[in-house]
């Protein structure tokens, strides 16, 4: 899958989640990390206007509404692999982190589906000029895309490189014909080892350090297995190449991993086709610190059916839970960015070659007293 198709797939699902970087299982086709949703990370970029990650007030200011998720057997959030216990998706959270409260944000970028909104044209122009300077480009007046009376996208090109800035803070750098890496680097979607991928990311982090300005670049070498329907095919591991800034405290690292990160896309010839920099909190409003539940309490909520999911199966056997992690969902269409415990549960779907599909189930991490509509899947079955 080349970077253009990869980008289109991401845009269609966005985001996501992963979430992300976030992986989806749809007709056995691997789609990219989506902003969670998602994509899914988190740094103060050189070209990014930061958002106050800490609330103005310690007390929660509003009851929270949990969104619904469409359930579709043909496409749902999942991870496919052999042993989920060995899968590292790069999430910096771990159970030893002693959070009692976490911030919640109102998403100012997507009041509804469609083109991103949020930043002013002037703020977008600042990002465009800073990105061009970091890349050593001289640009003329950019092309604009409008949604009603608002400019929602700026585009400028020079010498085979195109920079796109969107009103939600996302920056894309497209390389016409692909940008070749030095011969010693092996940069592919599905034929690169972890060691080779780490070497590629080390190189890219240094090459684009002026653009990213990460104090402590952290690599995400995640991916999942995919099995083609073609006769005689063998599983292939589709990976993603992601960096985020891990120079902050635990909370900042989690937010950077989820909302602000850089992702690199190879083309079919192993050249760099696209560099995308996410900034999901650029237009977010911090609405307060909310008390959260523990992992054990989240397990109880999962067992009682208090979760949201796109998976068309209920959780009926807790022994099938393979992994749990604390995440923020960051899809552009999320009205509120709040923390969840994401559980990966082995599904009854049959897979060839020993592969197992694990569906993703989200339990709100905020205490129930602050949730206006606690989900109850079993109550709504059918």
Question: What are the functions of these language-model segments?
Answer:
Residues 17, 135, 139, 306-309:
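Short, flexible helical or helix-coil boundary motifs
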Residues 55-255, 259, 278-285:
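Preferential activation on post-signal-peptide N-terminal prodomains/segments
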Residues 163-181, 252-279, 349-382:
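A short, surface-exposed beta-strand/turn
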Residues 1-30:
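Disordered, charged N-terminal biogenesis/targeting segments of membrane/secreted proteins
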Residues 95, 122, 126-131, 135-142, ...:
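A eukaryote-biased signal for long
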Residues 199-341, 345-352:
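Segments that shape or occlude catalytic/ligand-binding pockets
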Residues 10, 35-61:
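Single-pass transmembrane signal-anchor helices and their membrane-water interface zones
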């Amino acid at each position: 899958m080349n970077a253009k198709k990869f980008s289109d797939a991401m845009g269609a699902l966005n985001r996501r989640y992963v979430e992300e970087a976030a992986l989806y299982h749809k007709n056995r086709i691997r789609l990219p990390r989506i902003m969670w949703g998602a994509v899914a990370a988190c740094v103060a970029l050189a070209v990014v206007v930061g958002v106050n990650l800490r609330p103005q007030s310690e007390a929660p200011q509003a009851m929270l509404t949990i969104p619904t998720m469409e359930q579709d057997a043909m496409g749902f959030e999942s991870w496919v692999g052999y042993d989920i216990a060995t899968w590292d998706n790069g999430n910096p959270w771990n159970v030893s982190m002693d959070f009692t409260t976490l911030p919640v944000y109102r998403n100012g970028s997507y009041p509804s589906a469609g083109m991103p909104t949020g930043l002013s044209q002037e703020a977008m122009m600042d990002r465009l000029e800073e990105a061009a300077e970091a890349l050593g480009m001289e640009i003329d007046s950019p092309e604009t895309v409008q949604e009603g009376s608002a400019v929602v996208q700026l585009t400028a090109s020079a010498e085979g490189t195109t920079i796109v800035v969107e009103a939600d803070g996302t920056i894309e750098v497209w390389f016409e014909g692909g940008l070749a890496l030095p011969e010693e680097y092996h940069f592919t979607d599905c034929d690169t080892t972890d060691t080779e991928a780490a070497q590629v990311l080390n190189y890219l982090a240094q090459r684009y350090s002026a653009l990213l300005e990460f104090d402590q670049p952290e690599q995400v070498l995640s991916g999942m297995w995919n099995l083609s329907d073609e006769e005689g095919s063998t599983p292939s591991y589709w990976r993603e190449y992601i960096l985020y800034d891990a120079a902050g405290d635990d909370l900042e690292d989690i937010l950077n991993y989820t909302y602000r990160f850089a992702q690199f896309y190879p083309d079919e010839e192993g050249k760099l086709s696209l560099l995308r920099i996410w900034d999901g909190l650029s237009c977010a409003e911090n609405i307060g610190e909310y008390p959260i539940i523990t992992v054990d309490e989240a397990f109880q909520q999962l067992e009682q059916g208090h979760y949201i999911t796109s998976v068309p199966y209920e959780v009926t056997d807790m022994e099938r839970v393979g992994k749990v992690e604390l995440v923020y969902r960051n899809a552009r269409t999320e009205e509120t960015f709040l923390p969840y415990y994401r559980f990966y549960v082995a599904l009854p779907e049959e897979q060839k070659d020993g592969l197992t599909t694990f569906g993703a189930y989200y339990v709100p991490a905020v205490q129930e007293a602050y949730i206006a509509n606690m989900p109850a899947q079993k109550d709504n079955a059918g």
